[in-house]
């Protein structure tokens, strides 16, 4: 999990009026993105919509006191297909990235097993496919001046391409007029794109 999303706050005054959407809600022990982004939205008299396909994650979030958060139990693609927009802030943080696919870490194996229970397959390829589809589905609802944050996604200087969860989505977003504001591998693992 990356923490670059925290740097997105400095760009929020540049975006149009629109919804704040998080695809992939916070889980116990992670970076706390849902609470942080909810606070940003609240400061702007907005609501955060956080979307997660795991009902247990949604139930845990509903147990917290998050007055300005709508919790939606859905996969990101279905939610974005049905939303009418406008969206000015989008955080793509669902699935997870297997940093060591030849020697997968235990926490990733646990997530892969949970995804399988819920009828989905979690691999690096399915993660990239999901994020690309979400970027495509979100585009008609994105405001002209908007921000998209991609978790666990960075520019790989050695290979000359974007790697990670949204590695396939970043070139598409650049083609839609977004520009890279920040991208970093270690230690924050993420990419922030803006269009204005």
Predicted regions mapped to residue ranges:
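A short alpha-helical cap/connector motif
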Residues: 1-196
